[in-house]
A protein has these predicted regions:
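Amphipathic, Lys/Arg-enriched alpha-helical "gate/interface" segment within cytosolic domains
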Residues: 1-121
Length: 121
């Protein structure tokens, strides 16, 4: 499941739970692109649980949308990643180090308040 919806002002919530198929990936990424269109200094609040690799078709959809997704990087300056997977937390730290102007911080699933405080600061 991939669910993307507005949170408090300037924050977009992204929930990933289990496997994502091509249809869910296309709907979700199009929604994310639309929501970020006029955004500046945006914040992303990820909650990733029960992670399973997306289907091959879903990865194809993501690959086809890469030009639009790369345009989003300049519109977002912080991301909080709540996850129950240690490797996802580590990957988010590495991703944040590689993307200039984007600060990504991992959190445990029960650290909603700390994650939101990070995004607000």
């Amino acid at each position: 499941m991939l669910n993307i919806y507005p949170g408090e002002t300037g924050i977009i919530n992204i929930e990933v739970d289990g496997e994502i198929d091509a249809a869910a990936m296309e709907v979700g990424l199009n929604k994310l692109v639309d929501m970020c269109e006029d955004m500046q200094n945006g914040k992303l609040f990820y909650r990733i649980t029960n992670f399973k690799m997306p289907t091959l078709a879903a990865l194809g959809v993501e690959f086809m949308m890469m030009p639009k997704l790369f345009q989003l990087i300049g519109k977002v300056d912080k991301a909080a990643v709540l996850t129950d997977e240690n490797w996802i937390a580590k990957a988010s730290i590495i991703e944040g180090a590689l993307i200039p102007g984007l600060e990504i911080r991992p959190f445990e699933l029960d650290e909603d308040a700390a994650a939101l405080e990070f995004l607000r600061s």
